[in-house]
């Protein structure tokens, strides 16, 4: 663990996923919800027949209790997780949801529990993506890739992961090189993507073990081939090398990450608009967003946290 993951930040953040057959996954929902609430843990966990996925945050002891409970279940005994720290609680509430898929691709008969690509450790990733026989693909969405990516990676510019299969099928040039290397934030999307690629006839398919988060934690910045910041799905918005909290903020109108420079734009109004969404929203939209911001401000004055903040 890097020096940045010290106890100077009070909240421990655990990102986790595990593809495994869970026949009675519904039985875990209430147990997990209660345990997390009792342990001061917030975030989101998704349960499905194909496994578990989510990110949670809380005091160290609370996170340890939840992880211990999960690993005590036979299906999740091999569960791995990635840790980082946050200066404030990055989630508003705890949600344990039942889903058809723990990461939604929308393609039938794709099962990472049966067929998947080859894991590549962070320390070996640079050599793979620097190989001229390798095509590198970022499996994340456009608002994520906009703030950071690996050098030389293809960006499908998808809005959702559901669009990824169509992008692959429409790009015959992906067959021009023998190796495909894919990555995502924590590893889950690229793992499912490798199962899809294998089903599409690609032979040498690789994915970054632990995702970008593990790479940023373990690979020194001076050796890194990562440029920019990594978008995360909590109130930190982004993290950088060493998993240090990034400087991006979130536009609460369009949910895009924005930089300090973009905040100075005349199109930016907190919670109402930014340069990414100003032209795609109506005045009626902005009026509604301003009313929401007003309610958020009132809640702050009362020492409360508005659900839309």
Curated annotation (Swiss-Prot):
Leading EC class: oxidoreductase
SMART domains (UniProt xref): RHOD
Residues annotated as domain Rhodanese: 130-224
GO MF term set: oxidoreductase activity, acting on paired donors, with incorporation or reduction of molecular oxygen
Superkingdom of origin organism: Bacteria
Gene Ontology BP annotations: tRNA modification
EC number, UniProt record: 1.14.-.-
Catalyzed chemical reaction(s): uridine(34) in tRNA + AH2 + O2 = 5-hydroxyuridine(34) in tRNA + A + H2O
Alphabetical UniProt keywords: Oxidoreductase, tRNA processing
InterPro entries documented for this protein: Rhodanese-like_dom, Rhodanese-like_dom_sf, TrhO, TRHO_N
Name of the protein: tRNA uridine(34) hydroxylase
Reported function: Catalyzes oxygen-dependent 5-hydroxyuridine (ho5U) modification at position 34 in tRNAs.
Family under the similarity heading: Belongs to the TrhO family.
Active site (UniProt): 184 (cysteine persulfide intermediate)
């Amino acid at each position: 663990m890097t020096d940045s993951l010290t106890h100077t930040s009070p909240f421990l953040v655990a990102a986790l996923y595990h593809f495994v057959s869970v026949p009675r996954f519904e039985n875990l929902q209430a147990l997990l919800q209660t345990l997390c609430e009792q342990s001061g843990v917030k975030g989101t966990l998704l349960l499905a027949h194909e496994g578990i996925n989510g990110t949670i945050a809380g005091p160290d002891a609370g996170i340890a209790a939840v992880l211990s409970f999960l690993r005590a279940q036979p299906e999740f005994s091999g569960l791995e997780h990635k840790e980082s720290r946050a200066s404030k609680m990055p989630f508003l509430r705890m949600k344990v949801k039942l889903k058809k898929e723990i990461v939604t691709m929308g393609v039938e008969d794709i099962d990472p529990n049966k067929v998947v690509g080859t894991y590549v450790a962070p320390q070996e990733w640079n050599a793979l993506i620097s190989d001229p026989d390798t095509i590198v693909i970022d499996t994340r969405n456009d608002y994520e890739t906009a703030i950071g990516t690996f050098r030389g990676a293809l960006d499908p510019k998808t809005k959702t992961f559901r669009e990824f299969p169509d992008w692959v099928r429409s790009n015959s040039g992906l067959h021009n090189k023998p190796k495909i290397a894919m990555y995502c934030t924590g590893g889950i999307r690229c793992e499912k993507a490798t199962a899809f690629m294998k089903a599409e006839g690609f032979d040498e398919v690789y994915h970054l073990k632990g995702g970008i988060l593990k790479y940023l934690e373990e690979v020194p910045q001076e050796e890194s081939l990562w440029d920019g910041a990594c978008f995360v799905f909590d109130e930190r918005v982004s993290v950088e090398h060493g998993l240090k909290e990034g400087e991006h903020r979130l536009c609460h109108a369009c949910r895009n990450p924005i930089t300090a420079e973009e905040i100075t734009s005349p199109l930016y109004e907190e919670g109402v608009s930014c340069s990414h969404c100003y032209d795609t929203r109506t005045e009626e939209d902005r009026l509604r967003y301003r009313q929401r911001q007003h309610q958020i401000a009132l809640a702050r004055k009362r020492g409360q946290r508005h659900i839309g903040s």
